[in-house]
Amino acid sequence: MRNFKDKKADIELIYKTANNLNLPIHIFLPEGDIHKAQAVLVIHGGGWNDAIKDNSPWNGGWMGNNARYLAENGFIGIAVSYRSLMVSEELNVGDILLDCADAIRYIKEHLKFIDFGDIIYMGDSAGGYLVTVLGLSQNDELRPKAVVSLNPVLGLLDSKWKYGFNNCADIGKLTPKNIIGEKCARFLFMHGTNDSTVEIEYTEELNDMLRKTGHKSELVKIPDAQHAFILYDYKYPDEYVTDIMDRIITYINAELK
C-alpha cells in the first residue's frame, strides 16, 4: 500500500489538446482485480482559473490526494483537469464543462476496465458545480450513477463567480436548478456551515428542489466547517480531511454498491 499523500498516478494520459494545452487524466489503481473495482472520478475546484494554464507537468491538482486515498480504499480514483479561464478571454464555464465531458468520453473509449454504469463523480467548489451539472445531464453517456458534490459553486451570478459566464449565450442552461429533468444521478451534497466563500443556502435550495421533484438527494451539513474542507494540505489537518473521506466511502459502500 502506498502513502495516499503520494500523488504520483499509476496511469497518466492526455485526453485532448485545446488552446495548445494538453489536458490530463491521472488514474490511481487499487490493489487486486481492477475490473471489480468501482470508479470515482474527482474534479477539482479553484475558482474557474486554478486549472491548466500551460503544459508543465500536472501533479494531480487539488484533489490528487483524494483520488489516491480512494484507490487505497479499493476504488479506482480518477483525477481530471480542464482549461483555466485565464488562458483566453473567449473561454467561459461552458468550455470547462465541454472539457469534462470530453474527458469522460475519452475514458469510456480507452479504459474499458472502468464500469461507467457504476461510476461516481465527486467534486469540490467549482468542481462541485461541474459534477452537479454532469449529474443532471439528460445525456446517458455523461451522467454518472451518483454525485458527491462538496460545497459546490451554485450562485453563478454572485460577483465572485459571474466572470466565468462572460460570453455565455444562455446562462440559464448552465444553472443547475434550471436544468433538473426526468433523468438524474443520485446526489450527496456536503457543505460546511461556516463557509463564507460559497453560501450553503444555494446548496440547500438545490437539494430541496431535487427531492421535491422525486430525485434522490441528501445534504450533510458539516458543523463549523469552512470552504474546501475536503482538501489535504489546505485549511485542515490530515486527520480531519480523512475523517470526511471515510464518511464518503462509508456512504458509497452502504448506498451505492
What are these regions (language model features)?
Residues S196-Y202:
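Conserved alpha/beta-hydrolase "acid-adjacent" motif
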